[in-house]
C-alpha cells in the first residue's frame, strides 16, 4: 500500500524501500507499554466488578492504586483510563468486567491477518473470500 500511495510531495517519487523497512522494524516499538496499560485497565475493571453487590470503594483513587500495586503495575507505565473517568465500568451489565475484550480483539485481528501474511499479500482474493464467508457473513450464527 505504501509503495502505491506514499509519494514525495514535491518530486512524486515513491517512498524509498529503506524507509519502509525502518517503519516495519519500528511498528511494535512501545507495544509492551500499550499492552500493560490495557491490561491494567482490564484488571481495574475486573476488580471493581468482583466487589460484593452494593459495595462501592469509599476512595476510588486509592482503590485503583491498591489494585494496580497488588497486580504489580510497573512504575511509570500509567493506565489508559483513570478509575474516576473509566466509563466502561458504568455502561450496564452488558459491558460489566469486559474491558479485556480489546486485548482479545487484538489477538483475533493478528491471527486473521496472519492468513494474509502466509498467503504473501494483504490483498489475497482467496483469503479475503474465506474471511468474508466464514467470519463476516457468518457473524454470530455458528457456535465457537
Residue ranges and their predicted role:
Residues 1-144:
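C-terminal, non-catalytic "cap/extension" segments appended to globular domains
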Amino acid at each position: 500500500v505504501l509503495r502505491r500511495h506514499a509519494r514525495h510531495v514535491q518530486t512524486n517519487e515513491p517512498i524509498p524501500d529503506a524507509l519502509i523497512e525502518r517503519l516495519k522494524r519500528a511498528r511494535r516499538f512501545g507495544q509492551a507499554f500499550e499492552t500493560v496499560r490495557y491490561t491494567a485497565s482490564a484488571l481495574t475493571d475486573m476488580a471493581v466488578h468482583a466487589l460484593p453487590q452494593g459495595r462501592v470503594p469509599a476512595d476510588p483513587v486509592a482503590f485503583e492504586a491498591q489494585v494496580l500495586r497488588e497486580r504489580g503495575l510497573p512504575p511509570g507505565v500509567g493506565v489508559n483510563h483513570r478509575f474516576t473517568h473509566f466509563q466502561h465500568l458504568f455502561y450496564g451489565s452488558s459491558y460489566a468486567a469486559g474491558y479485556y475484550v480489546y486485548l482479545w480483539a487484538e489477538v483475533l485481528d493478528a491471527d486473521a491477518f496472519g492468513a494474509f501474511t502466509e498467503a504473501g499479500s494483504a490483498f489475497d482474493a482467496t483469503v479475503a473470500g474465506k474471511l468474508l464467508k466464514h467470519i463476516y457473513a457468518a457473524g454470530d450464527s455458528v457456535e465457537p
